[in-house]
């Protein structure tokens, strides 16, 4: 479960708006570890539709390691609430995941964001990560 905070907003004459934001919440990985996710970024919306999105997220993982991801709006399908993110940095065994592009799905209910991410990784990498 993730919370969204709009930090700035600019309205344009065509009805579109530019926002900066922060997202915080918890996530679970398929290996059973948990993480606290902190993101910041910006987005452009028009008529309630997402036009562009950029975001960087930092995950503090329950095994005392870290992972960073990047979301860019040109690989997302806003109407479905799905998109792609790339793992851009990590510590420890998670360095094996850097460079992977993953898929996410999200939905917002009462200002809370529910999200799920899926990353396909080689079995050898999964086994290394799952040992933690």
Q: Which sequence ranges carry the predicted segments?
A:
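Beta-strand-enriched cores of mature, soluble protein domains
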Residues: 1-132
């Amino acid at each position: 479960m993730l919370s969204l905070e709009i930090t700035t907003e600019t309205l344009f004459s065509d009805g579109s708006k530019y926002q900066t934001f922060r997202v915080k919440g918890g996530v679970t990985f398929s290996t059973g570890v948990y993480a606290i996710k902190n993101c910041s970024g910006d987005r452009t919306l028009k008529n309630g539709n997402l036009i562009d999105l950029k975001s960087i997220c930092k995950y503090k993982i329950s095994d005392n390691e870290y992972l960073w991801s990047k979301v860019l709006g040109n690989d997302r399908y806003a109407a479905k609430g799905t998109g792609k993110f790339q793992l851009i940095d990590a510590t420890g065994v998670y360095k094996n995941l850097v460079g992977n592009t993953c898929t996410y799905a999200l939905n917002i209910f009462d200002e809370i964001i529910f999200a799920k991410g899926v990353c396909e990784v080689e079995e050898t990498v999964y086994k290394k990560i799952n040992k933690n």
